[in-house]
């Protein structure tokens, strides 16, 4: 993030989302997209399953947990850990030490409470911190997991360098993000209308901007990584946006948003609505990117 003011704005947004219980019924303890079979009609109960499934699908895509126990990572860093749901799920399901980091103090408090409520205090730990300047030593973690965090980071290239820095030699890195389309060979920039749409989303959700898949390739090329893979999960995530807008713009849903979250909640929904429109227009995609740090 470019300035302390921007960092504080992001922290404040998630503090309000967390403390006011905005969208709690939909998201539960997971503040990220879900993974559905293509063509599924999402429901609230199905989304509670989908937001967990996307974690397992990402780990499967990255070939992290195989039958070979010798290759099992000893620890995980979840960057932009939110309310701790991802850390708690991975620690419980895969019996692994997990550390989460978030810039939001309220999110970290929620995360610690969640871990304690499930008896996982010895498996999971959480830190308030800046993802661009993490306090961890070089090579500290054998798996790095990032889900819909990079959109908040101003200096995305530095962020990529930072997560590679804290990754151990041979560690797998998994990133799920909302990415903008690649430029065509004849383009020097996105169309003005597209730029306007992305700026609107960023203003609503305190995002710093979106990178493209080409950006990932350019940033990773000089780094000590190998075996990069990319998957387009846009259609797998799409049912969530339909569900969110259906619930939020119902009379009951909209009144609940205003009562519980005020203008902050309304901005979140308007931002998600604009993301949905950008996806429909092929401006944005939901992507999974994975690669391994060289040994």
Curated annotation (Swiss-Prot):
Residues 139-147 are annotated as: SAM motif II. GO terms for biological process: alkaloid metabolic process; methylation. Residues 166-175 are annotated as: SAM motif III. Keywords: Alkaloid metabolism, Membrane, Methyltransferase, S-adenosyl-L-methionine, Transferase, Vacuole. Its EC number is 2.1.1.-. GO terms for molecular function: methyltransferase activity. It is found in: Vacuole membrane. CDD domains: AdoMet_MTases. S-adenosyl-L-methionine-dependent N-methyltransferase involved in the biosynthesis of biologically active monoterpenoid indole alkaloids (MIAs) natural products including vindoline. Catalyzes the conversion of perivine to Nbeta-methylperivine (vobasine) by methylating its N4 nitrogen. Inactive with picrinine as substrate. This is Perivine-Nbeta-methyltransferase. One of its GO terms (cellular component) is plant-type vacuole membrane. The gene is PeNMT. It catalyses: perivine + S-adenosyl-L-methionine = vobasine + S-adenosyl-L-homocysteine + 2 H(+). A motif (Vacuolar targeting signal) lies at residues 138-144. It is an enzyme of class 2 (transferase). The lineage of its organism: Eukaryota, Viridiplantae, Streptophyta, Embryophyta, Tracheophyta. Optimum temperature is 30 degrees Celsius. Mainly expressed in young leaves, and, to a lower extent, in mature leaves, flowers, stems and roots (at protein level). Transcripts levels are highest in flowers, moderate in leaves and low in roots and stems. It holds the Pfam family Methyltransf_31.
